[in-house]
Structures are given as C-alpha cells and as structure tokens.
Amino acid sequence: MTKKIEDLILYKDEHYFSSFPSIVLLENNTLLLLFRRARDSRWLLDAEDEESLLIKQQVDHVDSRSQITKIFFNTDLQAISEPEALTINPEAADQDASLLMLSNKTLLLSSFSWYPVHSRVAGALQKKGVSLYGHPDVTGCFYISWGGFTRQSHDMGKTWSAHDYLPVLPNTRDIIPEKRGRHGGATRGQAIEVGNEVLLPVYAPLKNDKVSCSHLLVSNDAGVSWQYRSIIARDQEQKLSLNEPSLLQLEDDKIMAFLRNTSGNDHLITTISNDRGKTWEDWQERKVIGHPTHPLKLKDGRIFICYGYRHEPFGIRGHLIDSSGTNFIGEEIIIRDDGFCGDVGYPWSVQLANGNVLVVYYFTENDGIRHIAGTVLDIE
C-alpha cells in the first residue's frame, strides 16, 4: 500500500513559467533540482473574467529566454540555495532537464533547445524546407528545433560545462538544409549507466517518416563523446509518435525503455533489450494512461513509475511494476488529481535515504501559475 505523506511547493514565482524538472540525490543526501524556467507575462493579468481564465489555461512551452535553473535542498526538503540559472546558451533557448549521477561522481545533464527566428526571415526559411514551430502572435516568434546537448558538472552541480551538442542522427533530415544536421534530436528522459557505457535515449523522426521515433546513443567515456547505437522503437504503420523515452536497467545487460505515445491514445509504450540496446523487442502498449513516464528502481527491486495525467481530473499518477518489468502490482496510485488544467506533469522521482520516494513535477493550481511541486510517498 502507498501512503501520501505530503505535497510540497518547491519553487513558485508568478513571473516565471516553471516546468519539466529533474532531481538527483547527491552524496551527502542533499538534493539537486533542475528545471526549465521561462518568462510568463500572465502575472500582468489581474482580472478573473472568462477571457483571463482561458489565457491562464493556455499552454506556453517555448520562450526565447528559457533557461535551466538549479536549487539545492537538504534532507528535510528545504531549499538551501537561491534559484540560480545555469549559464545560458547564447544562441538558443534551453528546455527540459534530465539528470544522471555517474559512477565517477560526474553529473550528466541532457537537454535540447529551440532557436528563435524572426518573422522577417521565416518565409524564406520555409521555402527552403525548414520546419518552423509556433507563430509570433502566439509564441512571440518562430522557433527551430535546434537539437539535443549535454553538460557536465564535476563539483556536485555547482558549476557546469558548456553546451555540447550531440552528434547528428543518421537517416534524419537536416534542421537547416546543408547547414545544420539534426544533432541528437530532442531529449527528455532518464539516461542510465551500464558497465562502462552511458546510454542516452533521444527522439526524432527519420528522414522519410511522418511520425517520430526513439533512438539510443552510447558513450564509452562517461558522456564526453557519443555514438549512435540503435532505434529503440518506431511505429512501422506511421500512426504513433514514440517520444520522450526513459531507460531503466533491469539486470546486467537487460534494459527497459518507457515511451510516450504522442499521437495515439496516450497509453504507455514499453520495450526491452537484452544486449544494452543493440537490439530491441517489439514494443508493447501497456494499460497505463499518461505521459511522460519516469521509472525508478526501488531498493527492494520493484519498479515505481510516475507520469503526468492530462485528462480530467488533471494531475500526477504512478504505478508499481515487478522487478522484471512485466506485471503491474496493485492499483494505480493517484498522486495528485487537483490540477487547474492539463498543463501539468513531467514527473521525476528519487528514493530518499529514509526509504520514502519524492516525486517532483510541474503543476498548475487555480491561480494559473506553473510551478515546481513535489509529493513524498511511503511505498510499502
């Protein structure tokens, strides 16, 4: 049985749209929280009329100045540092943060970025076949998906290396024809370390595909350089985009991937590899509804997954799975069901020193302020 101990607000500021968190337990049992922070001009709206309420519900996931922000917490889950933005990318806007502590005590951050494009050059770029996202009337400008990158910290998150873009994915369309390839696609999900390899999941469409698929990159030097290994999952029928993959090591070289089913019925997709991702079994649609999924192996060997639930009632949910990744255990865990709108989710979990599990996520309550929240669970 799972018992909720408490809900927490970890960071909330009406001037910012805070979202897409990741968290890691450091050596001294303190916690490092990273999340995307962007400007949010909705704080200027004082009215509670119908139009203002609709604006507060609107999704706004791109901003030309979005940044990855860090906060350190103690074992009592109290902030012990002020929010501080990591050094920014001077040419593009940083998005989701995904963290991994390596065995050599290096912190690996993977993320991706959007390149802002002025409206006066948008038409010419589109004629060249460049795919643009957004519109100045809605998102302030146009954007180009600029690729995935990694950064490293060798001092427990105090300082970080520069943005290092991932290699170009094979058999994918250039972001800018003959000028910029698709560097790693996008990343949102858990990387893992297996033996002497770091396995990093990413996602991007193949050159002739209509939908996106998930790919695996591998590093043999603790995340300094990367090579392409395989396609994790792809819909041969070209109906489902299989995105935002997260990895979990089951045992030895056996790993499991958890994927978002973007253009289908929002059911969780999973697949297993028995050789560190060189080959993958056929992917399966599971009974869980929600996205994206973060998997956590508990100290007793069971797997705890958490995911956003963007259907009424909006919130955060979870489930237990046996150690093989095959069978779901018990009933679905309702972590939160009081969201103001569907703009919630992207949870990440960590087991604390006392055995409890902390789930962090972004959330929206009736005031419309997107913030980073957390829930502490006692999982028996």
Residue ranges and their predicted role:
Residues 1-380:
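Asp-box/BNR beta-propeller blade signature and adjacent active/binding-site loops
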